[in-house]
Amino acid sequence: MIAAVILSAGESSRMGRPKALLPINGETFIERIVAALKQTSVGNVLVVLGHKVEEMKRQIAHLPVEILVNPDYKLGQLSSLQVAIRHLEKIDVCDAMLVHLVDHPYIDPALVATMTERFYQTGKLIIVPRYGSKRGHPVIFSRKLFGELLSAPMDQGAKAVVNAHRDDTLEIDTTDEGITLDIDTPELYKRHVKGE
C-alpha cells in the first residue's frame, strides 16, 4: 500500500490566507487534491497541519482524510514530512508514501496511477514526475528511505535524500505542467486559477 501525504502546515505568509482553503472551480485546493487522490489506488490519505490548526481542522473535517499535527511546522516542510513518516512507520503494509504539497492543486489521477504502477514494477526508491526539464509533485518515497528522511538535515529538506539516491530515482515524463505549478502568491493565484 502507498499512503498519500498532503503537506499543509505552513503559514501561507506570501498568500496572506491558508492555501489549502483557496477556491478553485467551486472547491478548495485541498478538496480538489483529496478528490483526485481518492480516484487512485493510494491507501490512507494523511494531511499534516501546523499553522492555525484548530481552524484548519474545522474547515477540512468533512474530508475522508486522517489529520496529523506538526507542532514544529516553523522548522519547514521536512519537519511535517517526518510527522507523517513516524505515523506511517507503524503501519506494516505501507510500502511507500506519495508526498504532495497543498499549493499544487493540479494533480492528475492518471499520473498518480502511472507513478504507483512504476514504483512496484521497477523497485526504484523514488518516483518523480518531470515536465520538460523540471521535476514536480507528487513524489513517491519508498519505505526504505523513511530512516534517511527522519535523519536528514532540516535546512536541506528531502532534497538531500533525493540527491543521495540519483541511481534509485525514476523520472516519469508528463505533458502536465500542473506538476510544477506552485501557487503561493496572490499574483500566481490570479494567473493560474482565476483565469481558468
Question: What are these model-derived regions, one by one?
Answer:
Residues K74-G147:
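Conserved beta-loop-beta/alpha segment of the NTase-like Rossmann-fold superfamily
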Residues G147, P153-E196:
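Conserved alpha/beta core of the MobA/IspD/sugar-nucleotide pyrophosphorylase nucleotidyltransferase superfamily
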Residues P23, Y106, V139-I140, E171, ...:
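Short aromatic/basic micro-patch
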Residues M1-K57:
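N-terminal glycine-rich phosphate-binding loop and ensuing alpha1 helix
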